[in-house]
A protein has these predicted regions:
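Post-Walker A helix-loop "phosphate-sensing" segment adjacent to the P-loop in P-loop NTPases
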Residues: 476-486
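Hydrophobic anchor at the beta1->P-loop junction of P-loop NTPases
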Residues: 458
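Conserved P-loop NTPase
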Residues: 744-799
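Conserved lysine of the Walker
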Residues: 466
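A short helix-turn-beta junction within AAA+ P-loop NTPase domains corresponding to the substrate/partner-engaging
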Residues: 502-506, 716-729
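P-loop NTPase motor domains
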Residues: 66, 73-92, 99, 103, ...
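Extended, folded cores of ATP/NTP-driven motor/assembly subunits in large transport
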Residues: 1-421
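Hydrophobic positions on the alpha1 helix immediately C-terminal to the Walker A/P-loop
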Residues: 469
Length: 800
């Protein structure tokens, strides 16, 4: 063991904490027994090994959930079989315990995760409104409970020195077994194990856990003194008190001939604090087979005795008691399972600890748990005068003091599948709200920046809530983070939100006085190429849209354009002042000066965009593109200009992203009606480039579209799907559903969440996690009024 380093000097705060712990440690009851005396372990080490008794040592692994209930039958079978193999790993030398803790969290814990702190600016009223909405959504779900799952395993050893290498080997094997199941798991260290015990013992107070290893030596206290409750009271045989909390432990009598995989899930769905503990002990295979054979011999002997009686009494010897016949056939089936079907024998103790603030509520909680057991033909029976032993057996320590065991085979034990549904509730400072988990009613709060690839797609039929979902994320992001936001808005839907957030709406149209110069050059435009090379590539794409027919630009034409681009920027590169920035007309004039007839052809094609009626892009930029939130409204650009407009906007986005990258700032780019970009080869290629390269530049693009088929129109465009780890999928049309199911590996059951689903309902793909969500945003809010795109609601707003 590594010695724990101690601080040379304790701070005043440390001393205060130690004094408080000493005061608590000195409390005893009338018999001189302290609460610490009831806690059944001897020593906890910093690496997480705990000595329970002279020769028994344990470690604890915390594991996360996976989507079992949402999986289709083949996947459920695969998970179940994987869990059977997991259980079969444990031999008779390893005792293990599965602990499921549903403990009430303090309101502060969640309030800190969801509240948006005021900034004393013009947006505080919206921040307050958004926080209130999140608090209301939280109240509807059962996020008041923190649900955790643990596997504690223990071995017998003569000393910590002998126990440690064996425990570490078993720990590695268990973590690998979890990995095979696709379950995230990690080992708890000593402080984390103490924190969990403290949480169980202090359900009434929800006090913060304060403890450091270097407090032990100067205080003379043990680890128990920092976790023990104010008191334990086990006066009555049927319940107990722990501090101000009432509790009772029951054991599950398994009476059903067949068990259901929903039993454990239903217990864990209860909306009150409870602990479910399963102590499992593998029986040595040789011993198990011998025991069953002995039982079969006993049954056969009884059968012969009954047959002899029948002969003597003069009736048919085949008529024997039905129980005897049933037990005989069941015992033979069990022997066959153990010998030839990869089944092992386990002894299971299944305990349920219910808690409440008063005896009446405790009775209600126990009744509810009992009803769940009865639903599955089992019985929940209160422990009589064993409440203390029951409570201590429910702690994730790996100690079972209740000797009520039921023998089960591997597959019968595995039916208590410890997986239900994944949760997505991240506590990070930039975790945004995406709705409520449709399976558990818990908030979905995630930070896209934590994904390997934060690129995203919002997909759905018209009216399913695509634009609204994008606006909600934009508002949340604006209020909570410092990210810049750029929107490409082909339908003029985002202006009310952008204006309320004091952003800049740039309306680009032939009649507008808002101008953007497509020739704008940022000298940081590229990381690995010269800015001019990348700009030349953009202008080639622009000219290809303008000039190129079906075959695009010819090699000679490309050479001429590249030559002119390098010439047109000479003045600006020598003296980079805004007034020296070239415009499209400067390029046009240079082309006119070239000798080749191809140059004249290109210049003629450009003429309408320079001196003709479509000259909206032949001006120096005169709008503030440095605002934190910028919306490019291109609705009024005609058919000819819209494609060019979208390409120019994408180039502006590159400019902004490169500036922000130098400032270590993220840029979020929202592309509504994204299918319009994918129809043209040039804009599609540029979009694919954004999806490939944005991440390392600090960019987070989000495509919003109803046309899934356009996303899969070519192998090149398919890269957008492959490079999007975030997909917010709303209601889908029949044909699109099948395409998406194949592309994203969605099960039939999961597809039901995007089939004829209501507005704001669907599936969220976050990395490898898939969750069904519901987002019903309150309509009586200012944010809803500025985000809605429903014509009747917009008309109502205008009438007001």
């Amino acid at each position: 063991m590594q010695p724990v380093k101690t601080k040379k000097k304790l701070s005043r705060a440390d001393k205060k904490q130690i004094e408080a712990a000493i005061a608590r440690a000195n409390r005893t009851d009338k018999k001189g027994k302290s609460a610490q005396d009831s806690i059944p372990y001897e020593r906890m080490w910093p690496d997480g090994i705990c000595r329970i008794s002279d020769s028994h040592y344990t470690k604890t692994i915390q594991f996360q959930d996976i989507n079992y209930q949402l999986s289709q039958n083949e996947d459920k079978t695969a998970i179940f079989e994987g869990w059977c193999d997991f259980l079969n790993y444990f031999d008779s030398s390893i005792h293990f315990q599965l602990s499921f803790l549903n403990l009430a969290a303090s309101e502060e814990t969640f309030a800190n995760s969801i509240s948006i702190p005021p900034q004393r600016d013009a947006f505080d009223s919206i921040r307050e409104e958004y926080t209130t909405m999140l608090q209301n959504q939280l109240a509807r779900g059962n996020n008041g409970l923190i649900k955790t799952k643990y596997l504690t395993f223990g071995i017998d050893a003569d000393s910590i020195k002998a126990a440690k290498p064996r425990l570490e080997r078993i720990e590695t094997d268990i973590l690998n077994n979890f990995k095979r199941l696709g379950v995230a798991a990690r080992t708890l260290d000593g402080k984390e194990r103490l924190f969990q015990l403290h949480a169980v013992f202090h359900m009434d107070e929800q006090l913060p856990f304060q403890f450091e290893w270097d407090w032990l030596a100067p205080s003379g206290l043990s680890t128990k003194d920092f976790i023990a409750p104010s008191s334990f009271e086990f006066r009555t045989g049927k319940q107990f008190r722990m501090g101000k909390k009432y509790g009772a432990v029951s054991f599950l009598q398994i009476l059903a001939p067949e068990l259901n995989d929903r039993l454990l899930a239903d217990f864990l769905d209860m909306e009150s604090s409870l602990i479910v503990s399963m102590h499992i002990q593998s029986v040595d295979q040789v011993k198990a087979i011998k025991t069953v054979k002995r039982k079969i011999t006993d049954l056969d002997r009884s059968k012969i005795e009954e047959q002899k009686k029948a002969v003597r009494a003069g009736y048919d010897m085949d008529i024997i008691p039905s129980d005897l016949a049933t037990y005989g056939s069941e015992a033979k089936k069990l022997l066959q399972d153990l010998q030839s079907r990869n089944e092992r024998m386990f002894l299971l103790t299944f305990l349920v600890l219910n808690t409440a603030d008063n005896p009446r509520q405790l009775g209600n909680n126990i009744f509810q748990a009992g009803s769940i057991a009865q639903k599955y033909n089992c019985q929940l029976t209160r422990l009589d005068f064993q409440q203390e032993e029951g409570l201590m057996s429910c702690l994730p320590l790996g100690l079972n003091q209740i000797e009520i065991q039921r023998g089960l085979t591997t597959s019968s034990t595995a039916i208590f599948v410890p997986f239900t549904t994944q949760e997505l509730f991240q506590n990070g400072k930039e975790a945004l709200y995406y709705g409520i988990n449709a399976l558990s009613n818990n908030l979905i709060m995630v930070d896209r920046k934590l994904l390997k690839n934060p690129n995203g797609l919002i997909l759905g039929t018209p009216g399913s809530g695509k634009s609204f979902s994008a606006k909600r994320e934009i508002a949340n992001c604006f209020l909570l983070t410092s990210d810049d936001v750029i929107i490409c808005d082909p339908e003029a839907e985002y202006a009310p939100l952008v204006e309320r957030l004091h952003g800049q709406v740039i309306k680009i149209s032939p009649t507008s006085t808002n101008y953007i110069n497509p020739m704008d050059l940022n000298l940081d435009y590229s990381d690995d190429e010269s800015p001019l090379s990348l700009k030349s590539d953009f202008i080639l794409s622009l000219c290809e849209l303008i000039v190129g027919g079906k075959e695009g630009l010819q090699p000679v034409q490309k050479t001429i354009i590249d030559r002119c681009v390098r010439l047109v920027y000479q003045t600006y590169l020598n003296d980079p002042r805004p007034e020296n920035m070239p415009v499209l007309e400067d390029l046009y004039n240079l082309l006119r000066e070239q000798e080749e007839k191809e140059a004249q052809y290109i210049a003629t094609a450009l003429e309408i965009y320079v001196t003709g009626s479509l000259n909206v892009f032949n001006h120096q930029s005169n709008v503030d593109i440095n605002n934190r939130i910028v919306c490019y409204d291109i609705k009024e650009l005609g058919k000819q200009l819209k494609k060019i407009g979208m390409l120019v906007v994408q180039d502006q986005v590159w400019n902004r992203v490169t500036i922000n990258r130098a400032a270590h700032k993220s840029t979020r780019y929202y592309i509504d009606e994204m299918h319009l970009l994918l129809k043209e080869e040039q804009t599609a290629a540029y979009t694919v480039e954004i999806w490939k390269r944005f991440r390392k530049w600090g960019g987070i693009p989000t495509g919003i579209t109803q046309n899934v088929k356009d996303l899969l129109s070519s192998r090149e465009v398919e890269h957008i799907f492959e490079n999007s780890d975030f997909v917010y999928m709303l209601n889908q049309a029949g044909g699109d559903r099948q395409i998406l199911a194949k592309q994203l590996g969605i099960s039939t059951h999961q597809l039901s969440y995007v089939t004829h689903s209501g507005e704001g309902e669907g599936l969220l793909f976050y990395g490898s996690t898939i969750l069904p969500f519901v987002d019903h945003f309150p309509k009586n809010t200012e944010l809803y009024r500025i985000m809605t795109t429903k014509p009747q609601e917009l008309k109502k707003k205008e009438d007001e």
